[in-house]
């Protein structure tokens, strides 16, 4: 029996000790909960990318006290839709069109359709842009123009590189410049707007700055057939086509009429064409056409041999025709005149070969347009693009750009009970973006915009003569006093020499502004402020006309309120009557 009692007492002690330990730990937790502040957490519930221009995110924000969740959710929603900056195309210059309903030759879409497609392009940048930027587009067909063909600054890029712009045929050519700006919400143009004329002059002055000396296909599509017009700056002005000892010299006086300035001669041969593939610029420094020939490529050599055979047949036909009629030429015609005709025919055959010589193979080879001769047009490099400046129309088309990166925002308020059985609210926030920003980053930026909006309200002082009780602002009081003194001297005194000469007039003019201030600028507490207002004391001038006894006679205005009013007046160097 003794052993059983000991075991029971021992078990009772162990249970009691365990209970006390739990109680102490619960007290510690409760104390910690009282000391520790409550945190608002943002967690992602769901997110998905529907396509490159549609991001979706679902977030939980909270906990909040009852009533606070609705305030935060509504403020966040409005901030997301109106305060976030975006980048977009705002103004376009198009060569070859004067109005938006015109259609350029070789372009499937009208100018209006192209502008609408440019409006839908979503741009983003590595940082916020504070000044307008310029972009370029200069392409010729056949091919499809997409967002990746736009020549943009290095820090700006398209969210969806495959976004459609236009389609060009064989004879199609599209040249344009456009202005890129950063803003909020959206923009609508007014013809008399000064900002529109500033952007228009900026767009007219801008010129493309291209350092590359080789042709470029579309960046995003290897199989694209669009080449960009790139001006080349070479040191060598000599005109050499293919170099070899066995060459046939072709005089090209008629090429001068076409705008092709050949400085020396045009040389053509077989061996260097197939073996060395040594190709230099066919045109001089001021008028060059950007296309290259690449060596050691099997597919390219196959197309080269086919081209060479066709070209050789044309040459043999010309030779036979020349030898057959040589005697007739010498007898019946002037030799110089006959020579010009043959040269014209030769240059014409070279410049406008058969269509099959221009056929591009459907291959993944990025150099599939090598060895294909291109017709050179007269180039006016005083203009921004490779078009004849005199015969080309220029149109300027503003775009009602949409800068908002947020497409849609929804929120839902849910109430839950925490561990202490207290009701807490949480916000379920749904955000859809256009792909230029992640939904979570958008919420952070929207919250930051709200903080920057409300932060000045903590520091605002309608009366700069007052000194705040907060120690954080005491250091800036000396600067405030200096500003006030400078304001007295510069704004009031130097403006009128008569005021500066008369000190009484000086003081009277400056103090008059202070006396007209409302007593709310004294930052009194609620009790003295309400008593003074009920006594019809509205301005500081009314207040200093009272004595201490008069103020103490006001109902509910005691000694403590009097001391508070006197301290507030001392800060403004004023006293009661």
Curated annotation (Swiss-Prot):
Classification via InterPro entries: DNA-dir_RNA_pol_insert, DNA-dir_RNA_pol_RpoA/D/Rpb3, DNA-dir_RpoA, RBP11-like, RNAP_asu_C, RNApol_insert_sf
Gene Ontology BP annotations: DNA-templated transcription
Keyword Nucleotidyltransferase attached: yes
Region called Alpha C-terminal domain (alpha-CTD), residue ranges: 510-577
Enzyme nomenclature, EC number: 2.7.7.6
Domain of life of the native organism: Eukaryota
Gene Ontology CC entries for this record: chloroplast; DNA-directed RNA polymerase complex; mitochondrion
Pfam families: RNA_pol_A_bac (PF01000), RNA_pol_A_CTD (PF03118), RNA_pol_L (PF01193)
Region entry Alpha N-terminal domain (alpha-NTD), spans: 1-461
Gene Ontology molecular functions: DNA binding; DNA-directed RNA polymerase activity; protein dimerization activity
Leading EC class: transferase
Subunit-structure text: In plastids the minimal PEP RNA polymerase catalytic core is composed of four subunits: alpha, beta, beta', and beta''. When a (nuclear-encoded) sigma factor is associated with the core the holoenzyme is formed, which can initiate transcription.
Protein name: DNA-directed RNA polymerase subunit alpha
Gene name of the encoded protein: rpoA
């Amino acid at each position: 029996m003794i052993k059983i009692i000991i075991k029971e007492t021992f078990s009772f002690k162990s249970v009691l000790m365990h209970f006390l330990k739990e109680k102490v730990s619960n007290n510690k937790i409760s104390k910690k909960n009282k000391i520790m502040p409550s945190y608002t957490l943002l967690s992602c519930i769901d997110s998905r990318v529907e396509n490159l221009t549609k991001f979706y995110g679902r977030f939980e924000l909270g906990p909040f006290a009852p009533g606070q969740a609705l305030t935060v959710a509504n403020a966040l929603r409005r901030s997301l839709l109106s305060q976030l900056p975006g980048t977009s195309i705002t103004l376009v210059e198009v060569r070859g069109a004067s109005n938006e309903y015109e259609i350029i030759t070789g372009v499937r879409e009208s100018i209006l359709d192209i502008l609408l497609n440019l409006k839908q392009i979503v741009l983003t940048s590595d940082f916020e842009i504070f000044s307008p930027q310029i972009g370029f587009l200069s392409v010729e067909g056949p091919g499809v123009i997409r967002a990746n063909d736009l020549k943009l600054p290095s820090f700006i890029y398209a969210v969806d590189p495959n976004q459609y712009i236009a389609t060009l045929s064989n004879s199609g050519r599209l040249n344009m410049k456009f202005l890129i700006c950063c803003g909020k919400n959206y923009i609508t143009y007014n013809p008399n707007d000064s900002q529109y004329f500033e952007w228009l002059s900026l767009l007219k002055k801008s010129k493309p700055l291209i350092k590359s000396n080789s042709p470029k296909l579309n960046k995003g599509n290897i199989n694209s057939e669009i080449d960009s017009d790139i001006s080349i700056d070479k040191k060598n002005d000599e005109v050499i086509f293919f170099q070899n000892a066995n060459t046939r010299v072709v005089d090209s006086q008629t090429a001068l009429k076409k705008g092709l300035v050949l400085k020396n001669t045009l040389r053509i041969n077989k061996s260097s064409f197939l073996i060395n593939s040594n190709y230099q610029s066919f045109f001089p420094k001021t008028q060059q056409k950007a296309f290259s020939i690449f060596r050691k490529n099997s597919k390219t050599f196959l197309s080269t041999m086919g081209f060479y055979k066709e070209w050789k047949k044309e040459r043999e036909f010309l030779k036979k025709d020349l030898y057959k009629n040589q005697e007739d030429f010498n007898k019946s015609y002037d030799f110089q005149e006959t020579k010009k005709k043959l040269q014209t025919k030769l240059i014409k055959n070279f410049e406008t070969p058969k269509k099959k010589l221009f056929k591009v193979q459907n291959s993944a080879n990025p150099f599939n347009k090598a060895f294909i001769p291109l017709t050179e047009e007269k180039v006016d490099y005083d203009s921004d693009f490779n078009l004849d400046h005199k015969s080309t129309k220029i149109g300027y088309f503003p775009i009602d750009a949409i800068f908002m990166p947020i497409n849609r925002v929804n929120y839902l308020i849910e109430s839950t009970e925490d561990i202490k059985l207290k009701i807490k609210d949480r916000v379920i926030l749904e955000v859809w973006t256009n792909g230029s920003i992640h939904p979570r980053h958008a919420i952070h930026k929207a919250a930051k915009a709200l903080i920057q909006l409300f932060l000045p309200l903590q520091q605002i002082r309608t009366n700069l003569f007052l000194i705040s009780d907060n120690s954080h602002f005491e250091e800036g009081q000396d600067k405030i006093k200096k500003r006030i003194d400078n304001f007295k001297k510069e704004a009031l005194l130097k403006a009128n020499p008569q005021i500066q000469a008369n000190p009484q007039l000086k003081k009277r003019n400056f103090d008059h502004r202070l006396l007209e201030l409302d007593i709310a600028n004294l930052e009194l507490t609620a009790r003295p402020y309400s008593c003074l207002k009920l006594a019809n004391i509205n301005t500081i001038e009314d207040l200093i006309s009272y004595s201490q006894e008069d103020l103490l006679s006001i109902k509910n205005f005691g000694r403590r309120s009097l001391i508070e009013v006197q301290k507030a007046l001392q800060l403004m160097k004023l006293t009661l009557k």
